Regions:
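C-terminal helix-and-tail extensions that cap enzymatic domains
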Residues: 1-149
């Protein structure tokens, strides 16, 4: 059985995904880029590779107990409230920011920051630690070469 340990290469954000954000932001539109790296406390031992693709959905909708069979910790609930607040703010006024939330800046291709819901339950914008690896993946893909999985 092959275990795939590079989910960022499958689900992004891939280089082409970043290009889309760059194009969107460069044309005067506002885009908010994020990575969700938080894993529910009780599931961390099982999910050592990190948060799965779509892992933020249960946090955004506050459904942490649905089908998981675990009780959310206070930290899990706090991350869920934070994610929910960002999404509601964005849906309401086009800006995820609000009172009591860490600032989520719009994507700026010149600064190239990513907002991350971090493994420790905090959140904030900073340089993307995966950028160099994703740039290599993008270059190999554009050149018609298979990325090294």
């Amino acid at each position: 059985m092959k275990i795939f340990r590079r989910p960022d290469l499958l689900f992004g954000p891939s280089g082409s995904c970043f290009d889309g954000f760059h194009a969107f932001a460069t044309n005067g539109s506002t885009a908010y880029l994020y990575r969700f790296s938080y894993v529910q406390s009780a599931l961390r031992e099982k999910m050592r590779a990190g948060a799965p693709h779509g892992g933020e959905i249960a946090y955004v909708f506050g459904t942490l107990t649905a089908g998981r069979g675990v009780t959310p910790s206070a930290e899990d609930t706090a991350v869920s409230r934070m994610a929910h607040s960002y999404w509601v703010n964005f849906a309401t006024n086009g800006d995820p920011n609000g009172p009591g939330l860490p600032n989520w800046p719009p994507h700026d291709p010149k600064k190239d920051l990513i907002f991350e819901f971090k493994p420790d339950g905090s959140a904030g914008a900073g340089p993307d630690p995966r950028k160099a690896r994703l740039d290599v993946t993008q270059l190999n893909t554009e050149a018609g070469k298979r990325s090294d999985f």
